[in-house]
Design a protein with these regions (language model features):
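Residue-level signal for inorganic ion chemistry
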Residues: 40, 75, 102, 188, ...
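Conserved SAM/AdoMet-binding glycine-rich loop
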Residues: 70-71, 79, 180-303, 314
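Short flexible coil/turn linkers enriched for glycine and charged/polar residues
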Residues: 134-137, 147-149, 246, 256, ...
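Active-site proximal loops enriched in glycine and acidic residues that flank catalytic Cys/His/Asp
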Residues: 190, 226, 254-256, 292-296, ...
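Short acidic, glycine/proline-rich loop/turn micro-motifs
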Residues: 262-265, 333-337
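Terminal RNA-binding accessory module
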Residues: 336-425
Length: 425
């Protein structure tokens, strides 16, 4: 059989799609880009815009694969299966539980068998194979799924369920296999990785897992996905600062720099508590890259509250800020809040925040000019080699490099969203 895969959304979805692709290949199936017998769409529902992207993807995939069995899994399929079904394009709907069954179901449907999709109970973490995807230099490893935080703007806890974690021994085994396969960098991802191990009895803190992984694979660089700032306590910093193979890039989810907005969002920290986490990281990991996400135009956000957020961005001196204008997500508390802002105001505030973020990013990267950095080349682009470094920003190398072979380069300037570098003579 020929399988095709299409992914929307986050790194967790990307990992899960890669895992399903590996499962299909292990059964002898061919992975193709077109003329597939079965197409698996991994959907996203983080915003209403995401839902529309899913539906457009369904229609396009059906046009491109008129005779294929098309299966939808993921968050949109989990939260709104009736809407998925109403498109008339999808043959199988599987949601976010028991992902591996979707391969079985596609095989049955293509062979003409009657298919019954069983709604799986939330029975724990579903372990899927980790592997380096074709054409990439880094591997993703999902260590956690689900979220217990219930921010007022977010539908994901309803799509993904409660926190579930990959057992430590399985994490060690998967990273060992990736290292043996020649992977130089592993990105640890999940829906809310700061909650890793809270479902275990006794609980296993994220810090403990990281210590074991970093110790077991000293020649592999580990990078963390998005972190709730509450994970960055003194223990986290004291126990991990000595590991050279932990990337000096920490993405802390902020969302707003104004305390009144944070309370409306049901974020469980204040701006001052967040700032102390940033300072803690910089003391433990000098020159580390601290990046963040920001939602502007949240319901009820005043000009003064927005101005407080801009000032807080500058105070934290983030290396990069992903700015999003608030998008109404039906089914969340925020969607019913008073004080919904018009799109023009939200767009204007997003542009102002992006300008601040652009200035901060350039200021952070300038400090590396003249310094020597580690880089992992990934692909050629525009006469340069694009590479990943330890600090979160891209490294563009002037000289010819070899993919997936770590190098040491000297930074000679800024380039696009990263730095320009060359081999030292």
């Amino acid at each position: 059989m020929k399988f095709a895969f299409f992914t929307l959304g986050c790194k967790v979805n990307l990992f899960e799609t890669q895992a399903l692709s590996q499962l299909a290949q292990a059964r002898g199936h061919e992975i193709v880009d077109k003329d597939a017998d079965a197409v698996i769409v991994n959907t996203c529902t983080v915003t209403s815009v995401s839902d529309h992207k899913n539906i457009r993807a369904f229609h396009k995939l059906r046009r491109d694969n008129p005779n294929a069995v098309i299966a939808a899994c993921g968050c949109f399929a989990q939260t709104d299966p009736e809407r998925v079904r109403a498109t008339g394009e999808i043959d199988l709907i599987c949601g976010t539980r028991d992902r591996a069954q979707v391969i079985d179901l596609c095989e049955q449907a293509v062979s003409g068998q009657a298919v019954q999709v069983h709604e799986s109970e939330d029975s724990g973490f579903e372990t899927l194979p980790a592997g380096i995807p074709h054409g990439r230099t880094r591997a993703l490893l999902k260590i956690e799924d689900g979220c217990n935080n219930f921010c007022t703007y977010c539908i994901i806890p309803y799509a993904r369920g409660r926190v579930r974690s990959l057992p430590v021994e399985q994490a060690l085994g998967q990273t060992a296999r990736l290292a043996d396969a020649g992977v130089h960098e592993i990105v640890l991802t999940g829906i809310e990785i700061a909650s890793y191990g809270k479902d275990f009895e006794p609980q296993v803190p994220l810090t403990e897992l990281l210590e074991k992984l970093l110790t077991a694979q000293p020649n592999v660089q580990f990078r963390l996905g998005s972190l709730d700032p509450r994970a960055v306590d003194d223990v986290f910093c004291e126990r991990l600062a000595g590991f050279a193979n932990l990337a000096r890039h920490f993405h802390l989810s902020l969302q707003s720099g104004c305390d009144t907005v944070l309370r409306r969002m049901n974020r469980h920290y204040t701006s001052e508590e967040f700032y102390r986490c940033v300072e803690r990281l910089r003391r433990a990991f000098p020159d580390c890259s601290v990046t963040t996400d920001l939602i502007v135009g949240f319901p009820g956000e005043t000009e003064d509250e927005f101005t407080q957020t801009l000032a807080f961005l500058e105070r934290c001196a983030f290396a990069s800020v992903h700015v999003f204008p608030y998008s109404v997500r039906e089914g969340t508390k925020a969607a019913a809040m008073p004080g919904q802002l018009d799109q023009q105001t939200k767009t204007a505030r997003a542009e102002r925040a992006k300008q601040v973020a652009k200035t901060l990013s350039a200021a952070y990267r300038k400090q590396f000019v003249g310094r020597t950095l580690y880089a992992l080349p990934e692909h050629p682009t525009g006469g340069l080699w694009a590479a990943h470094g330890r600090y979160g920003f891209p490294v563009y190398i002037e000289d010819k490099a070899e993919k997936n072979h770590p190098v040491t380069v000297k930074v000679i300037g800024l380039h696009k969203d990263g730095v320009l570098a060359k081999f030292e003579n």
